[in-house]
Amino acid sequence: DMRLKTLIMVCYGCGLRINELLRIKVQDIDGQRKTILIEQGKGDKSRYVVVSDSVLAQLRCYWKMYHPTGWMFYSRLLMDKPMSASTFRKPLRKHAQACGLKHCNPHTLRHAYATHQLESGMPLHQLQHQLGHSDIKTTQSYLHWLPELGHGGIDLLASWSKQ
């Protein structure tokens, strides 16, 4: 299902909250600047989020198939209304279970985005902006100790052992 695939890719690929995802308007997407305007996110704050090339390509395919004019993800019953949260949550949960994932919802996609971006080296302040957190401490909650990455520091005593 092209709609579900696109919803998943945008949610995970941008780290959006479900309400931010479902309230994207076609005009909010700027393919040239590779951004999406998130209007009135949590706390009624607006921000721009960076969009990857793969997410933009998927959005273009989706647009060519569905031709949305207002809401990017509109209700199938009322095109002038955004899709409801349950219309995304239910098929996401169903497909995740079919893949063997026990707990998958839009927030777990957001959490995975944050964790994976930190693992790949995204600076904490950039992630804070992307996620729309007003307090850096909220973003820091996505930091996990990952033994496979080592501690990321240098050996401060390496030069001493040569003396």
Residues covered by each model-derived region:
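Conserved catalytic core of the tyrosine transesterase superfamily
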Residues: 1-163
